[in-house]
Amino acid sequence: MKSLKQIVYSWVDKKFLGGCSNYNSLSTRKSCRSKKQAREMFSQNAIPHAKGEIFWGFVKPFLFAKKYGFPIVVKPNVSGFSRGSHFPINNYTQLLKAIVLVKIWWPSSVIEQYLKGENYRVVVVKNEIMSVIRRYPPFVIGDGNSSIEELIDRENDLREKMALYPVIHPIGKNLRTVRFLKKSNLCFTSIPSKGEMVTLYNRVALAPGGIIETLDKDSMHEQNRELFLKIIPYFNANILGIDAIFEKGIDFPYTDQRVIFLEVNSRPYLKMHHYPRYGKKQELSHFYDVLNRLEIQQKDIF
């Protein structure tokens, strides 16, 4: 069984974690490998988080939706980069479809309450915030003259000029985008009004063209800073990428708004912090100097 697990996680590492950092021990990585583990730790330490459950079959998610209502999110228990996630789910038909599709990624799945707000990745090292980014789904801004397709081409050209590829991806002009636009009665030939933001997909992941904005760490409210720093000792980690949604924003105290801490990443993808579409490129070399000097136990064992 042990060798089988090593084979599985080795495959996951090569297939899905290419380019991810590796500064935590095996015991730390094991302690936050699944979303369930993170949620349990959040619950034990009064960290605001979404109510959620692990499920294998079809009954439990429907009972969860009946108890807590919509919107909700369904995602694999073990995953990253928003792979296999489905949200916002607003009715039972969408829920059934999500239950079927989520099993493509992992046999055990998560159903949670969904919060609409600002999505952040905060990278924390011991006693210090390393980097703060806000993540957006792919979007374009109308100029009153250009079609959505033209705006996408312009945005992709700009990303290429900014040398964001291949870390940041181009926005796809594919069936997925067509279907998403159709939900808003839009298509590639539609012409948005000047200043109108047109969202092209619902996920903040990089693969469909998600957008990264770096933020000044000092813009984070002090209460929020203390909350993020509080988390890393719970996992005995050297570094964590912590994902959270703030209803108003990270510059407002978490006590004055709805906040959901989603998960912790023991191998955060740090490359994206160096290729922002918006905000300043961050200087993080002194953090890497410290991290690279660490002796990591069982670094290459999964």
What are these regions (language model features)?
Residues 11-172, 221-225:
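Active-site nucleotide/adenylate-binding loops and adjacent lid/helix of ATP-dependent enzymes
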Residues 1-17, 31-32, 195-202:
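Short, composition-biased local secondary-structure segments
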Residues 99-106, 228-235, 291-295:
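Hydrophobic, Leu/Ile/Phe/Ala-enriched alpha-helical segments that form helix-helix packing faces
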Residues 75, 243, 263:
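Acidic active-site catalytic centers that drive phospho-/nucleotidyl reactions
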